[in-house]
């Protein structure tokens, strides 16, 4: 835990603070001790780490982007259409429960990555170029800088306060109804509700529009796949 958060008799920064304004990548997420993963909750929520010692309290900045990867089960083949999973249902459940619901709640995008077959790997077809993606992202970031120019400490949609979410994530009737249905069916928390709106706002920015639509909400909810089936 000290390596991740920081600590010691003379407290120093841990990995989360060293990743401040950058990316912290954790591979094989369930292989970390659950107690180690749980300490990520405070910095993910507050953007800082506070370490208390007898001599006093030290606070380190920790505004980082968490990127994590994991297998669907211990053998890695659960859900694979070509290879049989060797894990029993209790084994899969135990493996996945190493990641708590509250931590999962703080991760905005859940993406399931299917196996890429040989045909796709060897294909000569070229996808969207990184330069085009970068241009779109820079345009979206420019929209956000302009949007939050009068709000100190807020530079991106992810940092929006509840008041800013209400102001900049207004929904029409169709989008609101879709979000309400998802909240009920997936038993989502208030935190997940706000994070869905932030992601939807970003999707709209990437599309170059100020108006949030039902499609933006639908896509943002689609990125909460682990909320829907993680504990099934």
Question: What is each stretch, according to the model?
Answer:
Residues 21, 27-29, 39:
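Walker B catalytic acidic pair
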Residues 10-11, 34-231:
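Basic, amphipathic alpha-helical bundle interface domains used for macromolecular binding and assembly
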Residues 2-24, 57:
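Conserved alpha-helical scaffold flanking the Walker A/P-loop in AAA+ ATPase domains
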Residues 1-3, 86-87:
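Short, flexible loop segments at the rims of nucleotide/cofactor-binding pockets, characterized by
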Residues 17, 31-32:
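Extended, folded domain segments that form the structural surfaces/walls around functional sites
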């Amino acid at each position: 835990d000290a390596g991740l958060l920081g600590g010691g008799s003379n407290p120093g920064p841990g990995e989360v603070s060293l990743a401040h304004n950058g990316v912290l990548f954790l591979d094989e997420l369930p292989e970390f001790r659950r107690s180690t993963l749980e300490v990520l909750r405070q910095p993910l929520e507050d953007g800082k780490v506070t370490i208390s010692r007898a001599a006093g309290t030290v606070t380190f900045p920790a505004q980082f982007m968490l990127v994590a990867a994991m297998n669907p089960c211990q053998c890695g083949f659960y859900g694979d259409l070509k290879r049989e999973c060797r894990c029993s249902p209790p084994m899969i459940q135990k493996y996945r429960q190493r990641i708590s619901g509250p931590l999962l709640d703080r991760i905005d995008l859940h993406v399931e990555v299917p196996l890429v077959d040989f045909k796709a790997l060897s294909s000569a077809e070229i996808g969207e170029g990184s330069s085009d993606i970068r241009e779109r992202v820079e345009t979206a970031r420019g929209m956000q800088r302009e949007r939050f120019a009068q709000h100190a400490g807020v530079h991106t949609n992810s940092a929006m306060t509840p008041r800013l979410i209400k102001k900049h994530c207004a929904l029409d009737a169709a989008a609101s109804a879709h979000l309400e249905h998802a909240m009920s069916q997936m038993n989502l928390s208030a935190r997940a509700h706000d994070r869905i709106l932030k992601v939807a706002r970003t999707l709209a920015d990437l599309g170059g529009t100020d108006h949030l639509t039902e499609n933006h909400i639908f896509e943002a909810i689609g990125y909460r796949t682990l909320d829907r089936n993680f504990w099934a």
